[in-house]
Every structure is written in structure tokens, then in C-alpha cells.
Regions:
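Glycine-rich phosphate/pyrophosphate-handling loop used in enzymes and phosphotransfer proteins
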Residues: 1-174
Length: 174
């Protein structure tokens, strides 16, 4: 990616990126884990290795009595590799708040019907620990959640969940 998203006023035909750059973002495809949304190898495979292991171990640090975390199903916009990985890094750590417009627009295009079909009442951002948010300057999940809620006409509830413990970053959870 050239790291040059178009401004909202310049967006043409719903495209926030240059055509050449957009081809660098690889779609996830149809064969994904039913729980987390990661690609799976076989067409009939329902769960990825990690989610299968979670079911087998019947352990959950999040929700007692279930092998899964407290969310029902995850979705991904692009494969988390190459350009998408770099773009996410810039969004999180490079103060590229305008990326939220692009990600929210893509989420609405790819999953808007799925989200509204689930009778979702509100979009709730994943909170950051205050110290981490202060260091980073903002919570990218909060910015994205607001844009997505606006795009889908849903309530936005930033105070619905609070992070009171400074946990390890998701990338360190395995």
C-alpha cells in the first residue's frame, strides 16, 4: 500500500484506495473458522486449529462454562499478512485515524447484512488500559467502532465495557 488513503471528499465509487493498492489486500475467502474467522485449510473444516484446541481443552479464561471467548463469531476484512498487516500496524501505532473510515466502509460492504441479520443493537469498542491508550494517543478500536456504528445506523456504546486490568497484548496471547 502506498499509505495514501483518499480523503472522504475524494472517494469515488466507494473506493478509498488506489486500484493498484487495493489489489494488494487479499480477501479472506469463504473457507474460514466458524468461531474466529481465520482461514482454514479444508473446505468442510468448521474450526481452525486454535479453536479446535480450545474446544478439546474446554478451557476459557473469558467465559466460565464455554470453550470459547465471550464473542460469538469473528470476521476479518483481509488476510492478516503483507500489506494488510502493515496497514493495521500504521492504524494502531502510526496515528492513521483516517484508516477507520476505510475499514468501516469495508466492514459495511462485506458484513453489513450479516451484522444487521444478527439483530445487533450496539457497537461496543474493545477498551484499552488507560496507560496504554495515553502512550498510543488513541484507541483505534474506539475510532473504528464509532465509524462502523455510524455506517450501519447502530448505537455506539463506548462505556459499555471497561478494561480495569493491564492485560498482555493480543499478539502475545498465542
Amino acid at each position: 500500500m502506498c499509505d495514501d488513503l483518499l480523503e472522504a471528499a475524494e472517494v469515488r465509487n466507494g473506493e478509498w484506495t488506489h486500484r493498484k493498492c487495493k489489489t494488494k489486500l487479499k480477501p479472506v475467502g469463504d473457507n474460514v473458522c466458524y468461531h474466529c474467522g481465520r482461514p482454514v485449510r479444508r473446505e468442510k473444516q468448521e474450526y481452525c486449529h486454535d479453536c479446535t484446541r480450545g474446544i478439546q481443552q474446554k478451557q476459557s479464561p473469558y467465559w466460565k462454562g464455554t470453550p470459547f471467548s465471550c464473542y460469538q463469531q469473528g470476521k476479518a476484512l483481509f488476510l492478516y499478512q503483507d500489506e494488510a498487516k502493515k496497514m493495521m500496524y500504521r492504524f494502531k501505532y502510526g496515528n492513521r485515524r483516517t484508516y477507520a473510515d476505510f475499514f468501516a466502509d469495508e466492514a459495511q460492504k462485506q458484513y453489513g447484512d450479516w451484522i444487521t441479520g444478527k439483530s445487533v443493537e450496539a457497537v461496543v469498542p474493545v477498551p484499552m488500559y488507560r496507560k496504554k491508550e495515553k502512550q498510543r494517543g488513541y484507541n483505534q478500536a474506539d475510532v473504528f467502532a464509532k465509524k462502523l456504528a455510524d455506517a450501519l445506523g447502530l448505537a455506539y456504546e463506548p462505556a459499555a465495557v471497561q478494561r480495569i486490568v493491564d492485560t498482555k497484548p493480543q499478539k502475545e496471547l498465542g
